[in-house]
Amino acid sequence: MRASPLAVPANAPSRKKRLELDDDLDTECPSQKQARSGPQPRLPSCPLTLNPPPAPVHAPDVTTPSRLGPYVLLEPEEGSRTYRALHCPTGTEYICKVYPACERLAVLEPYWRLPHHGHVARPAEVLAGTQLLYAFFLRPHGDMHSLVRRRRRLPEPEAAALFRQMAAALAHCHQHGLVLRDLKLRRFVFTDRERTKLVLENLEDACVLTGPDDSLWDKHACPAYVGPEILSSRASYSGKAADVWSLGVALFTMLAGHYPFQDSEPALLFGKIRRGAFALPEGLSAPARCLVRCLLRREPTERLTASGILLHPWLRENAIPAALPRSRHCEADQVVPEGPGLEEAEEEGERDMGLYG
């Protein structure tokens, strides 16, 4: 099997999915998940009234192990769409994402649009068959959600070094007409074992803009990261400003060890987000507090742009350390949770949008 050439058609349409917020706001796991120990409570349905999502196109199951050119597909990682893969000539491990061949344009369009950037993951190779499309990505060394869940609060120099990379990835996407919509800590993965270098992954669901107008109408978001304007009754909202809000939630979580807005009841959670009131943890520097407040503004037009974040004094003053220190802070109150039921997995064609992550 040969690698398929990635030439973007001149009249390629953009994909804008319409998805619902999931009823279960307490996990990110789809219905196809392993048995969990103990009862798993279900939360009441989301108070938002949204149009139902279109039925996804499911990729046929792949029998493993199977040979694809120089690769061998091993066991599935998350459901039936993501597999461990081994590049036989070099022994390098990859992650292989499998899609129906008919989704080739929608899956690859964000990567066609976006020039190379050091903090945005790209497929190392794409193989196209008659029924399936195989995209191979270098295997990461964990993600930011897992790091914060394990470490709790990160010291400011370390948080700044990591957040600078996250903001640079978002600024690059916005500069080239991509709105991420479902931005969260888990989408930033480490490329090194020391966990100092980050890349943004999973651009397949990004919205590709056709012009300078970034207005969106869908409700594609993770409840813990959703902006107040998405919860309002207004017809449209700025996709870029919504991404910046989500990045602000990520920064707060890195510095505090818990989300800025939390509640076990969806209606109360969304009420807190609409009000936009949150308490910053003690001990943060004035520049760090300033940056968080500049991102978590209720009014979208008052938030910093993604490129403006990189100019903020907190990121300019905190030089990247030679070796990132280990955090000794540990918060027991509403931390990014551990335990079963919180690992990310994907429904085929639709993300399960949980409270944690």
Curated annotation (Swiss-Prot):
Domain Protein kinase residue range list: 68-316
Cross-referenced PROSITE patterns: PROTEIN_KINASE_DOM
Presence of keyword Nucleus: yes
Pfam families in alphabetical order: Pkinase
GO biological process, one term: negative regulation of MAPK cascade
Region feature Interaction with DDIT3/CHOP, mapped onto this chain: 1-127
Record GO terms (molecular function): ATP binding; mitogen-activated protein kinase kinase binding; protein kinase activity; protein serine/threonine kinase inhibitor activity; transcription corepressor activity; ubiquitin ligase activator activity; ubiquitin protein ligase binding
Acidic residues bias (residue ranges): 341-350
Keywords carried by this UniProt record: Apoptosis, Nucleus, Protein kinase inhibitor, Transcription, Transcription regulation
Region listing for Disordered, in residue ranges: 1-63, 333-357
Annotated localization: Nucleus
Primary localization: nucleus
Tree of life domain: Eukaryota
Keyword Ribonucleoprotein annotated: no
CC annotations in GO: nucleoplasm; nucleus
InterPro entries listed in its UniProt record: Kinase-like_dom_sf, Prot_kinase_dom, Tribbles/Ser_Thr_kinase_40
Function: Inactive protein kinase which acts as a regulator of the integrated stress response (ISR), a process for adaptation to various stress. Inhibits the transcriptional activity of DDIT3/CHOP and is involved in DDIT3/CHOP-dependent cell death during ER stress. May play a role in programmed neuronal cell death but does not appear to affect non-neuronal cells. Acts as a negative feedback regulator of the ATF4-dependent transcription during the ISR: while TRIB3 expression is promoted by ATF4, TRIB3 protein interacts with ATF4 and inhibits ATF4 transcription activity.
Quaternary context: Interacts with AKT1, AKT2, MAP2K1 and MAP2K7. Interacts with ATF4. Interacts with DDIT3/CHOP and inhibits its interaction with EP300/P300. Interacts with APOBEC3C. Interacts (via N-terminus) with APOBEC3A. Interacts with RELA.
Domains as described in the record: The protein kinase domain is predicted to be catalytically inactive.
Name the record gives this protein: Tribbles homolog 3
Source organism per UniProt: Bos taurus (Bovine)
